[in-house]
């Protein structure tokens, strides 16, 4: 089990450091594969409920050691109950190699409006040939099922009137928690993810209203996290210790190296961007000996930019937005990045970059109320005028 670097648990303080510069490509080296494996949790057995849905057996807990080697297994995991007593079922694909090896888990659908992440995982699993593999790859595709059914970021609950909960603030959850989403997280983490995982990749996209390019979020102080992230040909990495409640942070707390790829915009498939993440994921499998083959393009080939902070530019007025920069554009302090007009067409606000950095997110809606994130910048220097860290 790796020794995790000490982390200040305050969410805001995690994002305060703004001191990193883009690393010279010659200085970016792959971390060596971690020696040893995370502490093994108590073994759980596979429990079949006896139900079959669309030809797939249903499990309430899974141990991939129980599955036949050299094959793909399609299952449903029985999650938390709905208000009518039926369960939410989560789609699980296990590619069980013919030989033992690393166990790598891919997740998507923690936010319900993030479609390219799901497509990326589906594509990866479709390319695997278990008979040629050493180890196991498990994909869990639609974790926040009710959010996905309504194509929205947050989990809808009706226990205290209608409310929306961000599932990616609930991990590792609690099987006996005070909300359905907390219980779903607890069931999935304790009975499916943690017992079957040595390395984990939690795929996301931007959210409705905020577009992002291809980039990663992860803590590069952890050797296996650094190694995995640099195996993707992505143009940017946010080197960031995750705060509590996020799935990849829950993995790390459990001794399992993990990070989050961000696969473009929400709500639609970006078929130009997903191949970047498919290629990188295959590189991870090859690096860790799960599948044979030569490693393809990596972060070095993409001239990767690494930032330590994400600094937002917030709207100060309501009105119509006119963006003056694009995703992945380099910006400098004082550079005008957007302006805002009222209904008469009069300019009511102009916005400038507080830092040197790379544009990592842009508001996609053409209007905004005051206080919304207009854009955020992956920063390589301390912000001017006390600019606040990105609140996500």
Predicted features along the sequence, with ranges:
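N-terminal secretory signal peptides
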Residues: 1-9, 16-27
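Structured catalytic-domain cores with a bias toward divalent-metal coordination
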Residues: 2, 9-15, 32-392
